[in-house]
Amino acid sequence: MKKLLMVQGTTSDAGKSVLVAGLCRVLARKGVKVAPFKPQNMALNSAVTKEGGEIGRAQAVQAQACRIEPSVHMNPVLIKPNSDTGAQIILQGKALTNMDAYGFHNYKKVAMDTVMDSFARLKDEYQAIMIEGAGSPAEINLRQNDIANMGFAEEADVPVIIVADIDRGGVFAHLYGTLALLSPSEQARVKGFVINRFRGDIKLLESGLDWLEEKTGKPVIGVLPFLHGLNLEAEDAITSQQALSDEVKLKVVVPVLTRISNHTDFDVLRLHPQIDLRYVGKGERLEHADLIILPGSKSVRDDLRYLREQGWDKDILRHLRFGGKVLGICGGYQMLGESIRDPFGVEGEPGESVGLGLLKTRTELTQDKCLINTKGQLSLNGKHVNVTGYEIHVGRSQVNEYQPITKDDGQLEGALSECGQIMGSYLHGFLDSEAALELICEWVNGVRIKAQNHQQLKEQAIDRIADAIEEHLDLSQLGI
């Protein structure tokens, strides 16, 4: 019999993604062939799958917890916002179209067919599926045609547990209120509650747990402790927590663009004890750094306009005058060039924007999206190191500069300015390659930094979650 379980939350960021990742690792360690599943995800941080499709990064991390390759069927509906009211809709890894919120709400009945198709494929292949909901199942205005939470659970007939973050406060109101707002049939499939991120003496919580169980008739399956320094990729909110030592060798600043994407590119910098990574927000200056990194963006021309509104273009020029280095990744790479054309209105109104003019490149946004995992060699300062990464972009750039990356298929990638201070690349995640990070640090200011094994750090984090789940949850109540 298949092991199926859906984790829903009282709020966004309640701990659904982490709990699913941990449950996946618990099962994988027992030899169970398990896969993650999230019917609908809204995120600007995405990953490339084995099929050359696109899914939310949380599902890619969960696949790692299962010790399998990520697949488009693990997240069949991905919504990538490109404005306050509109988003790109991605079905089974491929971009379908742009829709406003009302249009997608009406499209959900069609999207449910795609969701159930992917779910059926995973059920055919795996012994267990750990499913993640989205946001809260109790959003009254979103319940009609729901495909992300109870709408899916009812259609697929799967049991549900509800998780809440006690660190935010109000955990009993969150859990009791969420359950109360569900229909009788939805309430019946809730098997219990999990309380996440608890600090302190569990005895002080016991009276509240007893009250909750008495009022709802549902068991509290367990209370997970606050896991300090848990270094897993954040899907939405930018994480600024660092691991600094007294010996900082490199200072990096990243401007927070309005549609910043794949900020997980910078986790490897944030977690290094000798690198001081600082995110710079609205009204702040890009200063006191060795390296400025322009991140990816879901709306490159709009974010380029925003960058100029903040005066960051002037900060970049001043930084370069004093010998600093600038790196652009994906959308940030496009901004560094001479122009960005969007003749088809792929990311908004059709038109052309003047770039920062720091690289001799010209970019045209196309209707076909490049989705590929890439391996190659990075050549800087007369040194050559292996590099891996992934590409997710709709632009094609004409480059009239030295190209520092040679892909395994022989294609050249990226651009390095003649002055040697400015570099751009379409490769997300290439800083995760230890040798590449060390070479980039040496390029920036000549410092030698020993890179950490980023994959190993993620593995350790996943195992910590699984250990906590095995210790603090009554898994027998879940059949695990």
UniProtKB/Swiss-Prot annotation:
Describe the location of the GATase cobBQ-type domain by residue ranges. 249-436
Q: In which pathway does it act?
A: Cofactor biosynthesis; adenosylcobalamin biosynthesis
Active site residues per record: C330 (nucleophile), H428
Coiled-coil ranges from the UniProt annotation: none
Q: What SUPFAM superfamilies does this protein map onto? A: Class I glutamine amidotransferase-like, P-loop containing nucleoside triphosphate hydrolases
GO molecular function (one): ABC-type vitamin B12 transporter activity
One biological process term in Gene Ontology: cobalamin biosynthetic process
Q: What keyword terms does UniProt attach to this protein? A: Cobalamin biosynthesis, Glutamine amidotransferase
Q: Name one Pfam family in it.
A: CbiA
Q: Entry's InterPro entries? A: Class_I_gatase-like, CobQ/CobB/MinD/ParA_Nub-bd_dom, CobQ_GATase1, CobQ_N, CobQ_synth, GATase_3, P-loop_NTPase
**Which Gene3D superfamilies does the UniProt entry name for this protein?**
3.40.50.880, P-loop containing nucleotide triphosphate hydrolases
Q: Which family does it belong to?
A: Belongs to the CobB/CobQ family. CobQ subfamily.
Question: What's this chain's function?
Answer: Catalyzes amidations at positions B, D, E, and G on adenosylcobyrinic A,C-diamide. NH(2) groups are provided by glutamine, and one molecule of ATP is hydrogenolyzed for each amidation.
Protein name according to UniProt: Cobyric acid synthase
Native source organism of the sequence: Vibrio vulnificus (strain YJ016)
Q: What lineage is this protein's organism placed in?
A: Bacteria, Pseudomonadati, Pseudomonadota, Gammaproteobacteria, Vibrionales
Point out the gene that encodes the protein.
cobQ
